[in-house]
Amino acid sequence: MVFAGGERDVASAKTIRILTIPPVMAAIEILVLRFVKGYFPGAAAIWTIFFLSILPTVSYLVWWVVPALRRRGRKTQRPLAVAFSVLGYVLSVGYCFVRPLGSVERIACCTYLFSGLVIALCAAFRIKCSGHACGMSGPIALLSLFVSPWFLLGYLLLIPVFWSSLRLGRHTPSELVLGTVTPVAGILCMMMLFPV
């Protein structure tokens, strides 16, 4: 029975990680900013969701359909996800300035790029920073600043996210904390660059 409970724990942890993947949180963030506050007007919301949500998700499809990548497991899955994510973040920042969009939109997109570069830099030095925690924390912090402080309650969602990551052995507590604070630092930096 203990083994069965363990299997249920693993299944629950995997489900939590799937439901809270960063691209889903990014899409929710953009939609809330669009429909509650009117940011990302017109087609900007669609394009930004494509850059921040759809493009990063494509990495998992590429990993799945290319046997050589799939055979190597998470050794290739994580770097591929980071690469596709950073590409999407670069495109979103470029779009913000070409369009051009306002300060809040620039803060949002530049924070994603900042966070992606920090995660990539950490990986280059063999330091793991939880992209999952980062992808949860960033939207919560941004929405609490620019929509309503009630969104700070969203940080309670990090409890099951932390549990699932620890249960599956994906991250250590320090890696999860590093991932959580990275986008907050990014938002603060971007707010100095793009005053609201």
Could you describe each region identified by the protein language model?
Residues 1-14:
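Short, Lys/Arg-rich, polar N-terminal cytosolic tail immediately upstream
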Residues 12-20, 73-81, 100-107, 121-129, ...:
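Short, amphipathic, aromatic/basic-enriched membrane-interface segments that mark the entry/exit
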Residues 13-14, 18, 44-52, 77-82, ...:
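Alpha-helical transmembrane segments of multi-pass membrane proteins, especially transporters
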Residues 16-36:
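The first (N-terminal) embedded transmembrane alpha-helix
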Residues 30-37, 60-67, 96-97, 119-123, ...:
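Membrane-water interface at transmembrane helix exits
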